[in-house]
Regions:
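Gram-negative host-targeted secretion-system effectors, predominantly Type III and Type IV
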Residues: 1-196
Length: 196
């Protein structure tokens, strides 16, 4: 049948190669299928459209999966399901056009999973409160943003390009809201910070 692929197939590959490499190879494979990609599920085709594969025919041909399309489709679905279980924040959780048009100062930002090591892929490591820096402005020459991780309180600087965008208020988890209130209390003498 269509789902004859054992569940542990993707688990073994992900354990050895990780999501970043596996996702690249799968997206590249779909890209190189040409018209045959229409035989994959609509969800897997849609997933591939969101993945970036650098145009490099000379080298990309070495990063393909050579298997029956039914197995490829089932494998991609397994990998997508495993990724979904991580419950990471993505563009769908962010304000539209954040990077191009929004000021980040005082806002909760979503750090892109591409910026983090896979061992740090948790929602707690993705949410950061932006304090200041030229990178807060979408039109500034500087890109640096001083911010605090809502998960563990670490303060550091990231570049504007490291973030997916500004988190929409409705996706702010309770634990993050508590941290923001904590920060607001600590900074009340300095004018406070916005929660949105």
């Amino acid at each position: 049948g269509r789902s004859a692929l054992k569940p542990e197939a993707s688990q073994m590959v992900l354990k050895r190669w990780g999501f970043k490499r596996t996702n690249f190879v799968l997206a590249n494979t779909i890209e190189r299928l040409g018209p045959y990609k229409e035989q994959l599920s609509a969800e897997n085709q849609e997933w591939q459209k969101k993945a970036y594969v650098p145009p490099d025919d000379a080298h990309n041909r070495y990063f393909e999966v050579d298997t029956a399309l039914a197995y490829l489709d089932a494998f991609i679905s397994q990998v997508r399901e495993a990724y979904g279980k991580l419950e990471l924040f993505g563009p769908e959780h962010c304000e539209p056009n954040s990077y191009e048009s929004l000021d980040y100062e005082g806002r909760v930002l979503v750090l892109s999973p591409d910026t983090l090591k896979e061992s740090c892929w948790t929602p707690q490591n993705q949410l950061w409160l932006a304090h200041d820096g030229f990178g807060c402005s979408p039109h500034a020459v500087g890109r640096s943003i001083r911010c605090t991780c809502l998960g563990d309180g670490e303060q550091t600087r990231w570049n504007r390009t490291d973030f997916t965008g500004v988190l929409k208020e409705e996706f702010l988890p309770g634990w993050a809201r508590e941290k923001l209130e904590e920060f607001q209390g600590q900074n009340a003498g300095m004018g406070g910070m916005e929660m949105t």
